[in-house]
Amino acid sequence: MKKFLATTCLAAGLLGLGSAASAAECGDVTIANMNWQSAEVLASVDKFILTEGYGCDAELVVGDTVPTITSMIEKGEPDIAPEGWVDLLPDVVNRGLQEGKLVGAAVALSDGAVQGWWVPKYIVDANPDIKTIDDVLKHKELFPDPEDPSKGAIFNGPQGWGGTVVTTQLYKAYGAEAAGFTLVDTGSAAGLDGSIAKAYERKQGWVGYYWAPTALLGKYEMVKLEHGVPGDMAEWKRCNTVADCPDPKKNDWPKDKVQTLVTKTFADRAGPAMEYLNTRAWTNDTVNKLMAWMTDNQASGEEGAKHFLEENEDLWTKWVSPEVAEKVKAAL
């Protein structure tokens, strides 16, 4: 019996040492908690998995794209920016990578952040010939202007948004006015969302600007229209994104790269935790649905993370080893 107890205690001690070694290897880690829903829930997913699966002492800290990434380069903190919109400040990110201050981990949003013109899925189901912007412009009767049903309507975002400028320029480039469409200023984010919700609930036609990932696209099934032309980045910068450019051309809307960024100092000491950060990625569809659940349930990032981990085991267990997966599942 004494021998059994001694063996048991030794095994427990070795397990404890292994756990302590893992925690010591990972150590304290700070994770930027950005101030929008998709980034907030991803930060909470990372915190839970790093804490419960890898024994890290993980902490969320307030963050935003520009100050967080700048601080990571200049001060070496926070350790992780889970949802880094790297295309918003390419020069800063490239400097951090070239100077050895930053390490690029997984592309967090595997299909990229998406902007463009969307229509309800029920419109496409009923009219399978509608695939592109030009296809929509042949069917103004399917997208009536609320103020003048003899015309079609394209719903734009509020003034001040980059997407609003681009939509205005694409409206010109595709000859939408000549096709009988008006460009509707929705006035605010709430106005834009409300126009989609109203159309969807009445099963009416709607076409206009939106983006992913968003909770609204998790609630309402929408289809992004193809632009019918290849992307031309030089032309995009010259005119499609410039409000007073007089001669915009048809163009494809580029996707934004959303990547997890890690400080070099943390990457060097993270051990197995870095393997997770190099692997963890999800799609717009997954995030849209999760954000819709969070919005409907007024859930926090932490609550959203636990819901995701409970409901999407087939996905997140691919990001970690079987041993880590068991630890995470036991903590839920």
Q: Can you say where each PLM-predicted feature lies in the sequence?
A:
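Short, polar/charged alpha-helical segment
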Residues: 38-56, 169-172
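A bilobed periplasmic-binding-protein/Venus flytrap-type ligand-binding module shared by bacterial periplasmic
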Residues: 114-125, 257-269, 292-293
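C-terminal lobe and pocket-closing loops
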Residues: 218-281
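Short, well-ordered beta-strand elements
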Residues: 24-38, 57-61, 151-155, 277
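Immediate post-signal peptide segment of exported/extracytoplasmic ligand-binding proteins
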Residues: 21-31, 143-151, 317-319, 326
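A conserved helix-loop-strand patch within extracytoplasmic ligand-binding domains
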Residues: 101-156
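Ligand-binding pocket segment of bilobal, Venus flytrap-like solute-binding proteins
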Residues: 70-72, 78-83, 155-236
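An extracytoplasmic/periplasmic, membrane-proximal ligand-sensing/linker region
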Residues: 38, 164-165, 169-179, 189-203, ...
